[in-house]
Each structure stands twice: as structure tokens, then as C-alpha cells.
Amino acid sequence: MSGGGGASAGDVSRETRERIEALVSRETLSRLEAFAALILRWTARINLVSRKDAAPAEIWNRHILDSLQMLPLVPQGAFRAADLGSGGGLPGLVLAIARPEIGFTLIESDRRKAAFLQTAIAELKLNATVLPVRIEQARLEPSPLVTARALAALPVLFGYAAPLLAPGGVCLFLKGRGADAELTAAAEGWQMRAERFPSQTDAGAAILRISELRRAA
């Protein structure tokens, strides 16, 4: 990583730096730096991230690394994926930068955030499109991969994801400390295979890999 201020990631901890460099190439890192700079510039106007997370080091650790840690769980190959409630492009645009062969559809109903996403896609020349509608209004071909971060409780999230998920596909959801309780609640209405992977950025959080998702009989 380059040094210096701004959004270059020069202020992150050594541990965060090493984790990011282990996941992406130097070229990808350069594009992530450009993306982080866009987040900083736009956050002053439309609150893409909370104010306490608006410092460069926090953007890299709490948002970019948080999204990048999903990479080892992303299926291989070229396909289209759906990112639900994309907000500031986390994780959708981060994954689009790291896996350019995957075409991401970013579903975001907030017009200002959708405008940010469209700007980032154009400036960074990403393989992604923005669908500025509510998730339940989205009309897409089912995808092998559906992603989301800090969007809704799992019983609701499964309702959003199921119509957009292709047979044999997987969901990757970044969840906070209530993930286990949410899985228990979701099991009342859904059948699934759920795998839990510990977060690298929050000791109590997790990445959930959901497959074989269907409504309970």
C-alpha cells in the first residue's frame, strides 16, 4: 500500500494492511484506493458511512476489509450476482473491483446513493449496473450469488434473496453479533444450509454462507 494521507490506506494498522494485501493484487488495491477516495468525497454530502467511520483508516478496516473478507467464499467463474441494498457499494462494488469477471447488479432504492454507485461504476470502469428500485420490486434473472451487508434481519433478508437466487446458488451475508439468534428465528419459516465464518474485523460478527434456501413446508 502506498503511504500518505487521503484515501491511500497509508494510515491503516499493519495488521489491516497485511490482511488486505493478502487478498488482492497491487492493481486491485489501486482501484480500491480510488473507490475509498470517492466514498470520502461523497460521504460529506449523503452519509454513505456513519460520521465515526468517515476517517480513512475506518473506511479501510470497517468497510473495505469487511467486504474483502468475503472473497474466499465467492464462487469461481464469470456470472452475474445481485447485491441487495448496496448503499455505498459495500460489499457490492468492493467485490466488483476484486472480481471483475463477475457482473454485479446493485439494488439500491435511495436515489442519492444510487447516483454515487453509478458515478463509481463509471469512474472506475466496473462490471456492474445499478437498479434503483426497492428490492421486492427487482426483476432479475436468478443469480448464482446474492450478497448483502447490514441490511435486515435474516427472516426478512431471506424473503428478499430467495426470488433472486438461482438453483444451487449461495447467499453471502455479513452479519453482526446477533447472527445466531437471527438464524434461529429464520428457521421457523425457512429451510437452508447455513455456514458461519468468523469476521476478521469484528470479533462478534460473522459471514454467513447460505445455500439450499427454500421456504419451510
Curated annotation (Swiss-Prot):
It catalyses: guanosine(527) in 16S rRNA + S-adenosyl-L-methionine = N(7)-methylguanosine(527) in 16S rRNA + S-adenosyl-L-homocysteine. GO terms for cellular component: cytosol. Keywords: Cytoplasm, Methyltransferase, rRNA processing, S-adenosyl-L-methionine, Transferase. Its EC number is 2.1.1.170. InterPro entries: rRNA_ssu_MeTfrase_G, SAM-dependent_MTases_sf. The keyword Transmembrane does not apply. It is found in: Cytoplasm. One of its GO terms (molecular function) is rRNA (guanine-N7-)-methyltransferase activity. Its main location: cytoplasm. It is an enzyme of class 2 (transferase). Specifically methylates the N7 position of guanine in position 527 of 16S rRNA. NCBIfam families: rsmG_gidB. This is Ribosomal RNA small subunit methyltransferase G. The gene is rsmG.
